[in-house]
Regions:
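Glycine-rich phosphate-binding loops that contact phosphosugars or nucleotide phosphates
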Residues: 1-75, 84-88
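Short, amphipathic alpha-helical interaction segments embedded in low-complexity terminal/linker regions
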Residues: 79, 84-177
Length: 177
């Protein structure tokens, strides 16, 4: 854990000592810190750089934080992970394109994503996924651009792994021809 990381601490009460200590250790290592709590003005929230306080009120069964508090925390974590995936270039539109097709289930998902983005059929999806060694973003870029694997990888690297930016660059390049 270091300056390029973010540590998220989760506690319904916001007073779990080990979570507070984990955030303190993360701060000592120059990591950003986030608290997800279900209580106002908690010690954990005070420790974090960013505090997300999701006030859910008392549980239906007292002390059973897996119900309202846990459900609310799960929703917040889903939002944080989704936003992170978008910011990291793993998403194109509403599709999780940063997918390595390493088994049958993922291969089928990669084919569907490829077809949705390119408009090509599943046979072409298989062909390009084979050429890209299962890398969905690379397969899409190869199909759309006509680039070989190395040129497509270079184009993707030049756009920091963002498929959308790489596709825009290709379209812009072709407009100028």
């Amino acid at each position: 854990i270091g300056a390029n990381d973010t540590v998220v601490g989760i506690s319904a009460s916001g007073s779990a000592r080990f979570v507070i200590e984990a955030l303190q250790e993360a701060k000592d290592r120059n990591a950003a810190t986030v608290a997800v709590v279900n209580a106002s003005n908690s010690p954990l929230a005070a420790e974090a750089d960013v505090s997300i306080e999701v006030i859910t009120g008392p549980e239906v069964i007292s002390g059973s934080t897996r119900m309202k508090a846990g459900t609310a925390q799960k929703l917040v974590l889903n939002m944080l992970s989704t936003a992170s995936m978008i910011k990291m270039g793993k998403v194109y539109g509403n599709l999780m394109v940063d997918l390595k097709a390493t088994n049958r289930k993922l291969r089928a998902r990669a084919r569907r994503i490829f077809c949705a983005v390119t408009g090509e059929n599943e046979t072409e999806a298989e062909r390009f996924l084979d050429l890209a060694e299962g890398d969905t973003k690379l397969a899409i870029l190869m199909a759309v651009s006509g680039y070989d694997r190395q040129a497509a990888q270079s184009a993707l690297d030049g756009c920091n792994g963002f498929l959308g930016k790489a596709l825009q660059a290709i379209h812009k390049e072709r407009e100028c021809e």
